[in-house]
Amino acid sequence: MIEGFAPKVDGFDHFEYGNHTSLKKSITNRTAAIMVETIMGEGGIKVIPEWCLRGIRKICNQKKILLILDEVQCGIGRSGKFFAYEYSGVKPDIVPIAKGIGGGFPLGAVLMNKKTASKMTPGTHGSTFGGNPLAMSVGNAVM
């Protein structure tokens, strides 16, 4: 799926979707997080199996790696549940969301569990357009 999106961002490795062996081979002592789309929508719909998502969570726990579940396309009810990862019972550390939360208006957010959020101290993250009153009103109406 990376064809046409070169050059790759430095520091990211890719593993075969839904393949734990491929994932384990890509983990090094420098791996900070594993990021997975719960439902891939490029080139057809690909849903990561629940057993696979639970296995990735287990690997993250064992290696003390953050689990980022990308819900940009499938979040906010688009899968039938509020988040697609809810089908597996897995609890991610970070969840990027966007398209569904804005109802067609450009809006995104990043959700984190308490442990991860506690590392984000004031002044460590900012946004040029963060808190835009119109965008926040749209997001509030969608929610």
Feature names for model-found ranges:
Residues 1-143:
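Conserved N-terminal phosphate-binding loop of PLP-dependent enzymes in the Aspartate aminotransferase
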